[in-house]
C-alpha cells in the first residue's frame, strides 16, 4: 500500500519475513536502514532488535505480507511489545485472497452460486478445531479460500469431496499471485 511504502521509506530498521516478502518492497528503504531477515530469527531475537531500536529512538518496521489479521502470527509480537511498553501501529496490506481474485479476474460471490466466503486452512503443525475441519466447512457449499494448504493437496481434495463438493468444482492453487 502507499502507506506501507511511506513507512518503509522512513524506517531506520526493517525486519522482514524473508521468504514471504518480495525483495522489491525493500528498494524504497533509506541507504542507512538496518535490514534483518527474520526467516532465521527466533521471536526473542526479533523482539531484541525492536527493543534496541526503540531504546535508540529509531523507527522500526516489522514487514509481513498481506493482511496480518489473517494467519499473520502477530499476536505474540503485539503482546510482547505491550509488555515492553513499546507503542506500535498496524498497517495492513492487501490480503492474498483479494489479490488472487484480482489476478484471476474472478469474483468470490456470485448471485445464485455463493454469497458467502469461508476463509480457513487445513490442519498442519497448528491444529484446527473439529468444528472447523475442511469436511465440516465444505458442507456449507460456500466459496472457500484456503491458506497454508498446498502441502496437503491430496488430503484436501478428499476432504472437500467428503464435505460435499464435486470433483468438477472449480479450484485454483495460487502462489504469489500479485
Predicted regions span which residues?
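Class I S-adenosyl-L-methionine
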Residues: 2-94, 99
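Residue-level preference for alpha-helix termini and adjacent loops
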Residues: 1, 19, 24, 69-70, ...
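Beta-strand/loop-alpha-helix module characteristic of Rossmann-like adenine-cofactor folds
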Residues: 6, 60, 87-89, 95-178
Amino acid at each position: 500500500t502507499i502507506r506501507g511504502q511511506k513507512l518503509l521509506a522512513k524506517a531506520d530498521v526493517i525486519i522482514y519475513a524473508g521468504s514471504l516478502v518480495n525483495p522489491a518492497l525493500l528498494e524504497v528503504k533509506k541507504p542507512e536502514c538496518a535490514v534483518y531477515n527474520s526467516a532465521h530469527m527466533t521471536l526473542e531475537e526479533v523482539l531484541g532488535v525492536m527493543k534496541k531500536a526503540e531504546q535508540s529512538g529509531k523507527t522500526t518496521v516489522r514487514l509481513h505480507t498481506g493482511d496480518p489479521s489473517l494467519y499473520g502470527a502477530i499476536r505474540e509480537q503485539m503482546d510482547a511489545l505491550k509488555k515492553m511498553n513499546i507503542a506500535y501501529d498496524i498497517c495492513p496490506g492487501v490480503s492474498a485472497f483479494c489479490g488472487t481474485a484480482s489476478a484471476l479476474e474472478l469474483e468470490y460471490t456470485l448471485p445464485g452460486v455463493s454469497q458467502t466466503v469461508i476463509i480457513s486452512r487445513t490442519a498442519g503443525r497448528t491444529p484446527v478445531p473439529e468444528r472447523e475441519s475442511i469436511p465440516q466447512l465444505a458442507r456449507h457449499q460456500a466459496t472457500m479460500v484456503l491458506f497454508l494448504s498446498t502441502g496437503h493437496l491430496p488430503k484436501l481434495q478428499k476432504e472437500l469431496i467428503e464435505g460435499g463438493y464435486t470433483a468438477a468444482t472449480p479450484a485454483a492453487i495460487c502462489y504469489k499471485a500479485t
